[in-house]
């Protein structure tokens, strides 16, 4: 009995690195699912890379409605999964509750901040990457208008839109940017038919380039721009391959890297709670330049984008953050 107690005590005293082999990651995706070709899929890509490198399986759950988020987080924690990653700002309230119930379980949330000693929060400077998308879009549109289709009408998506407008106006101060949000509920992330309708409406009003930040809804946006012979801008994951020759670029939000890094840190024993903010300087956001859009981006256009990125990194250009004051003064 004494030997058993000593063994238990020694295991409890082990540093995190010594217990790293027990890591059992799990993911609760946002509405839209892990194959949305956008935000969720980026997270899934990072998880797959982690599994390939480590041999450790990552469990996951794809909610079909809002109420399932908290249930799934709690189920994974009860099952001993650790860390448990919550995808999307809409999971913040559920995670706040569950993290308190399981103080010894490590949690990660992407796109929101949950202030708890066992939660790592990863957020991005979407306005910076969107600014670059606006620069490139304005150059490609020449004297035409730009379009923006968001998913759910929330401050985070307004942040994308505001950065996009600011970047576009740095190239053409008089440019008009048409904007629509798909809806006000979680269903707005998974309505490609409505996304296509909104994009076609903007194109009919003169949009030559349409940027979407709309989850699976964005698939419909990009199909509509392609069908109309216009240019689309993808988001989160590299969506250039969806319609080669019709995708101007994609505004990459490296949720794949954030996911893989969080799981690897848990495995290595270096995981820490707190807030990580990833922008251009941290390679957390960027534009995609690849074979699929090489014919659409001239050296002059790319140089203008690179110069803008350098100016943002150095602080010479300040990109307004909609979420700082709930306004877009552009």
Label each region the model flagged.
Residues 21-330:
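A residue-level marker of the well-folded mature domains of exported/periplasmic proteins
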Residues 14-20:
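Sec/Tat signal peptide C-region and signal peptidase I cleavage site
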């Amino acid at each position: 009995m004494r030997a058993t107690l000593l063994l238990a005590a020694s295991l409890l005293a082990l540093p995190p690195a010594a217990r790293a082999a027990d890591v059992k990651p799990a993911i609760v995706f946002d509405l839209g699912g892990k194959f949305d070709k956008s935000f969720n899929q980026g997270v899934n890509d990072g998880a797959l890379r982690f599994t390939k490198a480590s041999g450790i399986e990552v469990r996951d759950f794809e909610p079909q409605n809002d109420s399932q988020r908290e249930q799934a987080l709690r189920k994974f924690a009860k099952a001993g999964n650790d860390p448990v990653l919550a995808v999307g700002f809409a999971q913040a309230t559920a995670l706040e509750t569950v993290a308190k119930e399981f103080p010894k379980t490590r949690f990660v949330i992407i796109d929101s901040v949950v202030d708890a000693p066992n939660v790592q929060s990863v957020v991005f400077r979407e306005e910076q990457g969107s600014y670059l998308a606006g620069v490139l879009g304005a150059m490609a549109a020449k004297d035409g208008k730009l379009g923006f289709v968001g998913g759910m009408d929330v401050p985070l998506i307004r942040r994308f839109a505001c950065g996009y407008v600011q970047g576009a106006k740095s190239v053409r101060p008089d440019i008009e940017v048409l904007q629509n949000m798909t809806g006000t509920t979680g269903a707005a992330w998974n309505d490609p038919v409505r996304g296509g309708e909104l994009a076609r409406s903007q194109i009919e009003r003169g949009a030559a380039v349409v940027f979407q930040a709309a989850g699976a809804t964005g698939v419909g946006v990009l199909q509509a721009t392609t069908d109309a012979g216009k240019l689309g801008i993808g988001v989160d994951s590299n969506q250039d391959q969806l319609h080669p020759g019709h995708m101007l670029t994609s505004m990459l939000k490296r949720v794949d890297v954030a996911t893989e890094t969080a799981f690897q840190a848990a495995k290595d024993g270096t995981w820490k709670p707190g807030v990580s903010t990833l922008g251009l300087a941290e390679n957390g956001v960027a534009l995609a330049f690849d074979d699929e859009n090489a014919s659409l981006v001239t050296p002059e256009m790319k140089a203008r984008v690179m110069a803008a990125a350098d100016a943002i990194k150095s602080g010479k250009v300040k990109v307004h953050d909609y979420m700082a004051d709930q306004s877009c003064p552009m």
